[in-house]
Amino acid sequence: VRAFIRDRSGAAAAEMALMVPLLMILMFGGFEAGHYFYTEHKIVKAVRDGARYAGRLPFSAYDCGSGTSSQAALIQNVTRTGVADTTAPPLIYNWTDNADVTVSVTCNTAETTKGIFTDLASGAPVVTVSATASYPSLFGALGLLDADINVAANAQAVVNGL
């Protein structure tokens, strides 16, 4: 019995067998966290691009009274896909609905505007683009994460009418 207790052969294999599950959890958890932050970065970049696109549209595309834009569908497409084409693939997997992107317009009438905004009686229009997309988990099929996790972002741009 003493020889069996003092025998150290196989100790490293036993330690490895105990550590592998923990190492796998850490490794795949790191993959999932990295993918989440990458997806979050993509939606932040998408709303910035959508707001930037909206800011370059002419002043006539915006109605300050109703807070809407006649070009809302194009702005939503640019935000969701990166281009105005409706057949382009989405930037985030499963982000297929333009209803997930909202476009709103506010006009600053409290300030006296000059420059390119001088002729606008309703003030300088500011476009806000907001978006929400469901997070496409790397390991969602395994049932490890809730399927209702969303990523969201918003961005604003002053309409330059260029």
PLM feature segments, named:
Residues E32-Y38:
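Transmembrane signal-anchor/signal-peptide helices with a preference for the extracytoplasmic
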Residues V1-A11:
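N-terminal leader/signal peptides at the extreme start of proteins
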Residues I5, M19, S130:
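Conserved beta-strand segments that form the floor/walls of ligand-binding pockets within enzyme
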Residues R8, G34, L57:
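Residue-level signal for short amphipathic helical patches enriched in basic/charged
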